[in-house]
Swiss-Prot record:
Function: Calcium-dependent, calmodulin-stimulated protein phosphatase. This subunit may have a role in the calmodulin activation of calcineurin. Appears to be involved in cytokinesis, mating, transport, nuclear and spindle pole body positioning, and cell shape.
Protein name according to UniProt: Serine/threonine-protein phosphatase 2B catalytic subunit
Biased amino acid composition, Polar residues: 415-426
Gene Ontology BP term (one): calcineurin-mediated signaling
Annotated source species: Schizosaccharomyces pombe (strain 972 / ATCC 24843) (Fission yeast)
InterPro entries reported in the protein's UniProt record: Calcineurin-like_PHP_ApaH, Metallo-depent_PP-like, MPP_PP2B, PP2B, Ser/Thr-sp_prot-phosphatase
Similarity-based family: Belongs to the PPP phosphatase family. PP-2B subfamily.
Amino acid sequence: MTSGPHNLEDPIVRAIRQKNQAPSHDFTIFVQEDGSSVSTLDRVVKNVQAPATYIPTDVEFFDINEPDKPDLHFLRNHFIREGRLSEEQTLYIIKKATEILKSEDNLIEVDAPVTVCGDIHGQYYDLMKLFEVGGNPANTQYLFLGDYVDRGYFSIECLLYLWALKIWYPKTLWLLRGNHECAHLTDYFTFKLECTHKYNIKVYEACLQSFNALPLAAIMNKQFLCVHGGLSPELHTLNDIRMINRFCEPPTHGLMCDLLWSDPLEDFGSEKSNKHFIHNNVRGCSYFYSYQAVCTFLENNNLLSVIRAHEAQDVGYRMYRKTKTTGFPSLMTIFSAPNYLDVYNNKAAVLKYENNVMNIRQFNCSPHPYWLPNFMDVFTWSLPFVGEKVSEMLISMLNICSKEELYETDLKESAPTQHKQPAPSENENKADQEIDIEARRQIIKNKIMAIGRISRVFSVLREERESVSELKNVSGTQRLPAGTLMLGAEGIKNAINSFDDARKLDIQNERLPPSNSRRRSTDLKAFEEVMNSSEDDTSIDHLVERFADKKSSL
């Protein structure tokens, strides 16, 4: 009797053939830890619009009624959704606005009523809030005091929208130059990287040309000198500003530098020294100016006050000591970037001047999309974390390596070869053995030290990834408090308890950046220190000596 084909079938094949059908599962539904279900086809936070991933056509870009001007309403909403323009559209806005800026004087004259605004620093979503508080640019005159770019991650959107407004309202929207509107700072901070990430180097270079065209100061209502930084020992009359050749990269000293970089003294109004100007050691360039220096300048030029930006303020503004002759504040600082760098927790403000009445309007920060540091993608950002853990695993594996495992390795290495060699003498054998032991000991040392260096490099890279706010520790150790880095950005925010803490932490980033050659030298030195730091690591040293001695003695 012959067996049928089913009787000869392998039990495993039969089990596969007769397996129960898998239960149906809807992969478009994801069950969260709390038991709630969400669709994988929908946005989890539905009230946040999806990013605009398309480049607009020229029909969308240009206004219907004014075909040579960009559509402001479209631009505003497109940038809110993180949309980008074509290279041609971007350059059109920059170049057309630059032509208007070039035609303006170094010292422009602005009548009242006007709304004066301080630093913006790439906080586009807060800029939209500013216009809600300050008024529609279509029927409100604005004077911006500079620093539109850097530090924030939406600088190019701020620039393009403000430049588009300048095209529409060339006689009612005024833009002054800040210290960040230059090649040196935008290369050092984030703006150049942002331009090349979102657009290309051609757009960045067009922005630099536009920065050189920005006016340096303004006389508002024939009463107020408005400028980004402040006064200078070389500034005696308003004609001194008019005589500057502004169409260049700002120098590191002189009148143009001081207009962009100078600050009032910390004890402004209660100075113990009679000096009008002293070196600004906080900025690394320019000067601190005194109350008496401001009063003297105002009297000599028949002005009421100086209005400037340049310094973050806890409540968005600061009024300084009043002059003896007019009883009006000699100096005012206005800052319009709320919760600066997402860690300062400060309010922002704009100054509205109308009918000889000055009002301060404050506002808080608005939600905005999150960017990883330096516009990194999540895979690049996570590599140092993975690398650090892998190197830690290698060191841990060395720590649990047993003497028997080392002995087995020795037996394999010392296994006899097929070719017979003449037997060496006893002295030669002993000398060769000592040389071989020392050589193997050095090889082991080098391998473990290499792992230590790799571990240290990944550790430093990981700390840089987590230090998203570019802040340095106030204690001067260049490291955040113990445990803070393990909590990432939230840990950094929690470690900063006040506005003053944030300013102290960020003080190094307020200085004039070093030159490119000095930066390269500093980076090289820092890399060498990182590579050498493993040699000073006692745990690595102990591991090296223990295993080198153990293995060489077997």
